[in-house]
């Protein structure tokens, strides 16, 4: 999987890896993994980090070497918001299936997620994502918003 990375990506990952390999022994500790990945623009949850560490740290010694790290990053990058996932997420918000997310639809989904938002907050979210200014979020605007996170 790491063979799908460009030389530039590998060099970038090596540089980040080296920053956290304090003693230069070619390994980083598992608790440093989250810091390394965040420095590369990934945003794993604690649960995801634990899963990744469990997958990579086969001997359970608490350290990860560079080849393991490369494999991990390649896998993580491949998993980053595929088009199918974005389409599915858009459909969750676009409750009436008209290809647009309205303020009411956004409020409904956010409320179901436990986010109690004021009308002003919902309107602000729409405004931030609404590139063409029609008061709704279309699929293209949704993708841009999701990729900007």
Curated annotation (Swiss-Prot):
Chain positions with N6,N6,N6-trimethyllysine modification: 116
Domain EF-hand per the UniProt entry, residue ranges: 8-43, 44-79, 81-116, 117-149
Additional information: This protein has four functional calcium-binding sites.
Function statement: Calmodulin mediates the control of a large number of enzymes, ion channels and other proteins by Ca(2+). Among the enzymes to be stimulated by the calmodulin-Ca(2+) complex are a number of protein kinases and phosphatases.
SUPFAM superfamilies recorded: EF-hand (SSF47473)
Name of the protein in question: Calmodulin
Molecular function in Gene Ontology: calcium ion binding
Residues given in the record as Ca(2+) 1 binding sites: 21, 23, 25, 27, 32
Species, as recorded: Tetrahymena pyriformis
Keywords: Acetylation, Calcium, Metal-binding, Methylation, Repeat
PROSITE patterns recorded: EF_HAND_1, EF_HAND_2
Binding of Ca(2+) 3, residues: 94, 96, 98, 105
InterPro entries linked to this entry: CALM/Myosin/TropC-like, EF-hand-dom_pair, EF_Hand_1_Ca_BS, EF_hand_dom
Pfam families in UniProt: EF-hand_7 (PF13499)
Binding site for Ca(2+) 2: 57, 59, 61, 63, 68
Residues annotated as binding Ca(2+) 4: 130, 132, 134, 136, 141
Protein family: Belongs to the calmodulin family.
Annotated positions of the N-acetylalanine modification: 2
């Amino acid at each position: 999987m790491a063979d799908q990375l460009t030389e530039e990506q590998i060099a970038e990952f090596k540089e980040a890896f080296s920053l956290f390999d304090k003693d230069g022994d070619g390994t980083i500790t598992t608790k440093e993994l989250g810091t390394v990945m965040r420095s590369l623009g990934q945003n794993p949850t604690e649960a995801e980090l634990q899963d990744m560490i469990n997958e990579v740290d086969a001997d359970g010694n608490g350290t990860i070497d560079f080849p393991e790290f490369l494999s991990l990053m390649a896998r993580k990058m491949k998993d980053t918001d595929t088009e199918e996932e974005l389409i599915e997420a858009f459909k969750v918000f676009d409750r009436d299936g008209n290809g647009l997310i309205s303020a009411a639809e956004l409020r409904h989904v956010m409320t179901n997620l436990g986010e109690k938002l004021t009308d002003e907050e919902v309107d602000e979210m729409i405004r931030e994502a609404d590139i063409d200014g029609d008061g709704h979020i279309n699929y293209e605007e949704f993708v841009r918003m999701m990729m900007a996170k």
